[in-house]
């Protein structure tokens, strides 16, 4: 193992004090979301177990959990493969995210603290500056952080839980768009933050819905162009 390699799953489990199957689940999910495991790619349990330095049992349990969430397809006698996101399914996810994001922004405008607003402003400014430099590799993580802070500012535990359960699946669809939309996306983020700062719940709702709608249209345009 060289200095840049992540530690084995077993070591990370010890550090985080989490069940082995959860650590394996998170690692496989991470590989799918960031594209190391491509849509439609076959997943071999024994190979994955060897790479993660675990037995096949936690790998099998992780794949079953990922199947239930739509990341993996399990085929009888053929094993597992990464799911393929159809255009219809992606559109459904965008519509769901638009509804949730609008509600989150509306509540954030009404309930945010000064500290939460400051953090949103900080990340929005950092994201815009990063997009301006062309450092696209850093944008997905900043985008995730922005939307996490936005959700936290809404101060609604049930809504936060709903968003969290969907966040990785949605990020899987969003990642390419986040990097390619660049400065446009971060201009939209700033407009959401401005509305929240002014306490304008209706405008915050509209800006957030427009932001997700623009991402959806860009994604669908890409899909049509690829045909």
Locate each region found by the language model.
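Conserved amphipathic alpha-helical segments that form helical-bundle/coiled-coil interaction surfaces
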Residues: 93, 97, 114-175, 186-194, ...
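Short linear motifs at protein or domain termini
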Residues: 1-110, 216, 220-227
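Mobile beta-alpha loop/short-helix "lid" or hinge segments that flank ligand
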Residues: 68, 72-73, 165-168, 181-183
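Short helix-capping/hinge motifs at transmembrane helix termini and TM-loop junctions
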Residues: 109-110, 155, 178-179
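C-terminal regulatory/effector modules of DNA-binding transcriptional regulators
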Residues: 2, 27, 179-227
